[in-house]
Amino acid sequence: MKICLVEPFHTGSHATWAEEYARYSGHEVTLLTLDGRHWKWRMHGGAVALAKRFMAEGLEPDLLLASDMLDLATFLALTRATTANLPTALYCHENQLTYPWSPDDHDPQHKRDAHYAFINYTSALAADAVLFNSHFHLEALISQLPEFL
């Protein structure tokens, strides 16, 4: 099976997971990534840049595996000529609804933090399957989602 793993924030644990998955998978895994910097921009604009590359490179995977840092709904909209019938899975390495904010980040103080969690939510809606790195992580998101919505 050919898998295209899409990761717009390719650094730290995100990079380790993607690279180790590609290395140890029994499948043919192609990494489609952006450098791991400016995470907020990557969540908003990463899908646009990666969709352009996906189309330009003519990738034809059997499965699209997206990181939770990707706005999957936007990515799929921009690549629908190729991905309309492509199975997709969203891998939740973390999520922006329950992930603790840095004390140096001013977005929560200005009530600008909810849209990152909403990107995670709409990405999950757009995916055919949603995978979590742990049962704890799954339960943390599911328990907070009703209040958020």
Place the predicted regions along the sequence by residue.
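Short, flexible loop segments at the rims of nucleotide/cofactor-binding pockets, characterized by
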Residues: W39-M43, H106-R112
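Membrane-proximal helix-turn-helix segments that form the acceptor-binding/catalytic region
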Residues: H110-V130
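A short alpha->loop->secondary-structure connector
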Residues: T82-N85, Q109-H110, E147-L149
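Short loop/turn segments at strand-loop or loop-helix junctions that form parts
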Residues: L32-L34, Y91-Q96, S134-H135
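Short catalytic/ligand-binding loop motif for oxyanion handling, primarily in non-cytosolic enzymes
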Residues: G12-H14, W39-K40, L72-F75, L97-P100, ...
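Short N-terminal targeting/anchoring amphipathic segment
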Residues: K2-C4, F54-L78, A84, A89-Y91, ...
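N-terminal subdomain of nucleotide-sugar transferases
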Residues: M1-H38, H44-L59
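A short, active-site helix/loop in glycosyltransferases that binds the activated sugar's phosphate group
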Residues: A124-L149
